[in-house]
């Protein structure tokens, strides 16, 4: 459910419609990317043999969501991946992990940790005002300002304007500003695995969410 939000639909790069899986050091790492949004999620796993592969995002998502709440076993083969859970078993075709784009590296210039539930409620109030016109990408974003124990979100489609303010504890003397895609902001905060607080950071051309 988490990485599915980053699955691409670019027919010229079919590998982006997949989910990258990597088993290592007692972890299973999942990645998705549409070259605009990249998502990485790690979960604890009993790894008997390390490896990596790419499988169809739509197929693996449909399989996993219909499986019972029990342990799932992944076993790699020659261009295949076997998925087993109790009495259910599937064999999927795979793509080469070597063709998967490396997850973006980033050095955060500024960060801000905020209560996720409060932020989600605020985003819901202004998100509907963001523009749906791709020709004006700046209006598809939500302006976030955190300063003096106040969070402010602003969105507009040039005809309507929505402003939402809330109080929260912030580091004294520090401020944080960013313009974040309204769709991304909304989708990230709607994830079921969202933690009590979310760290938002910026680079010169990226916004990063960590939770």
Task: Indicate residue ranges for each PLM-predicted region.
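Structural preference for solvent-exposed beta-strand-turn elements
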Residues: 1-211
């Amino acid at each position: 459910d988490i990485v599915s939000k980053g699955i691409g639909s670019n027919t010229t790069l079919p590998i982006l419609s997949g989910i990258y899986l990597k088993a290592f050091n007692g972890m299973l790492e999942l990645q998705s990317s549409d070259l605009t949004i990249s998502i990485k999620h790690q979960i604890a796993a009993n790894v008997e043999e390390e490896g990596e592969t790419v499988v169809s995002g739509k197929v693996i998502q449909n399989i996993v969501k219909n499986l019972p709440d029990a342990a799932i076993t992944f076993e790699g083969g020659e261009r295949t991946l076997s998925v087993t859970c109790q009495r259910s078993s599937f064999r999927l075709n795979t793509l080469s992990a070597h063709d998967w784009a490396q997850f973006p590296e980033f050095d955060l210039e500024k960060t801000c940790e905020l209560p996720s539930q409060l932020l989600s409620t605020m985003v819901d109030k202004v998100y509907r005002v963001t523009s749906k016109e791709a020709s004006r990408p700046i209006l598809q974003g939500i302006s976030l300002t955190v300063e003096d124990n106040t969070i402010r979100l602003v969105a507009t489609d040039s005809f309507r304007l929505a402003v939402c303010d809330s109080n929260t504890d912030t580091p004294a003397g520090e401020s944080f500003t960013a313009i974040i895609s309204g769709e991304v902001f909304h989708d990230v905060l709607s994830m079921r695995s969202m933690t009590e607080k979310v760290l938002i950071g910026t680079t010169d051309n990226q916004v990063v969410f960590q939770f």
